[in-house]
Amino acid sequence: MPEARAVLELVDQCPRQVLRGAFPVIVIEGLDATGKTTVTQAVAGALQAALLKSPPACISQWRQAFDDEPAIIRRAFYSLGNYIVASEIAQASARSPVVVDRYWHSTAAYAIATEVSGAVQHLPPAHHPVYQWPKDLLKPDLVVLLTVSPEERLRRIRGRGLERTSEEEELEANSVFRQKVEVSYAWMESPGCHVVDASPSRERVLQAVLSLIRDRCPQLP
């Protein structure tokens, strides 16, 4: 698969050990249609922060090809993307705050929900190592998780009419899969996710996120 070779070559170009800069790193997570991308862009603008995303732009052209592959190959693509993003975060955080549109938590939550068959009770228990941040991956200062009710998510998705990944379609069609993703997010540790209700207006959600960031990252101006 030529796309896999290209991704691996990019990973090989990343330094083995990345040292982050002095500025804070904030990750914003959320299921599809929670307003995550819009909020992420607004937060980056308000903080005059660098805006990054996972998977990063340098491999995003191959995302569709990997989304059509079996789960194990798809997960490898997103996992490797996180390590490429970590290298970008390290460089950017030396110059300004960094806001990241998805990172390791989403990769892990979707992987766990996909690999664990059956209902939510079959998930690994809370505090299981699978919910722990990888020791070799650059860690953010704060992870914000945007949430809306299943009914509101469905209304927004159907109103957008945008192309979705197979996993996003699964979220809409399969409430058990969605619940497993949500519980996996809730059980992430070191760092855990700080939940923000994304149901109100965009401006109210933005202010709630900025308030949380300034509370948790006092080094911001």
Q: What function would you assign to each model-found segment?
A:
Residues M1-L19, E151-P221:
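NTP-dependent small-molecule kinase module
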Residues V25:
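Walker A (P-loop) ATP-phosphate-binding motif of ABC ATPase nucleotide-binding domains
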Residues I28:
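Hydrophobic anchor at the beta1->P-loop junction of P-loop NTPases
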Residues L31:
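P-loop (Walker A) phosphate-binding loop of NTP-binding proteins
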Residues K36:
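Conserved lysine of the Walker
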Residues V39:
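Hydrophobic positions on the alpha1 helix immediately C-terminal to the Walker A/P-loop
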Residues A46-P134:
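ATP-dependent small-molecule kinase phosphotransfer cores
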Residues T107-V183:
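A glycine- and Lys/Arg-enriched "phosphate-lid" helix/loop adjacent to the NTP-binding pocket
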